[in-house]
Amino acid sequence: MALEALPPKPGLGMTAELHLEDVQRAVDVELQEHRPQRVLPAEWAPQSAVQLTWPHADTDWRDLLAEVTETYVRLAYEIASRQPLLIVSPEPDEVQSLLSRRLPAAALQNVHFVAAPSDDTWARDHAFLTVLSDNGAELLDFRFNGWGGKFAAERDNAINRRLFDTGWLHGHYVSALDFELEGGAIESDGAGTLLTTAACLLNPNRRLEGDAVPVPDRGQVELLLRERLGAERILWLHHGYLAGDDTDSHIDTIARLCPNHTIVYVKCDDPADEHHAELQAMEAELEALRTADGRPYHLLALPMPDAIHDEAGARLPAPSANFLSMPRAVLRPTYRR
């Protein structure tokens, strides 16, 4: 996977770094007009740090470890050049030694290392979800089960508690292990609206007997999201997928909430492509969605990357929407295209 660092795009509601403060003030004003008592901040909101869970020989990247490590070095550079970076690794000394040779001193000073065993690298899915409330920052530790039991996740599921016990994170630890929820399964606008997919959140493989919501019941799931994340509106998509995707249609692979009532989404214009019908149906769903004040969202389409296949000929997911938003940059995958 190649990586491209982009300045904030006008289509995403950010004109350029020069005007970022003006845009941030506009977003802040919007949130002040309606700020829930509990809120899951939007990804583009100011961040105390970005977490990377570093690849190693026991992760799913083992056969491509050298190449993938190079991508992570580039990720570390792009993030740490702009803001603090938290790196979780079972061998943090080795990672620190590598980055000390590859990153400039100013960026390296922004990197904090934590030792923790891990199964894989999907930090967005196994990391804390931070909710802001009248009590300050609440670090919600939801259960991660390897996307419905497809992969081992016991070590990933223990990272949050280990991180909190280091004392480096600021906020109140809140155990939410009675509910399986991955960060990539939900999008928040920071003002009470969540966007998600039924294929993931209502999938029986995410629910367990004895959980807070033991069955895939939409009403019960919505109630839990309202209580724990402060959601006031939950927008559901029932269409859209990527072939080969293990996440059961994570929203962060197909459609993303962005500033200024914008949704960026994956579009497929090739009628011969297997995704065409589903993504067309998803586009129609997005066109029907409304903001909290009843207006249609601004929709910005991302082109579907050319098909990528593994050595056996199976199609691999290449989610162009699976980018990382930071206050001063957007990092997006390019898949060498």
For the regions a language model picked out, list residue spans one by one:
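The feature marks the mature, well-folded catalytic cores of soluble enzymes
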Residues: 2-337
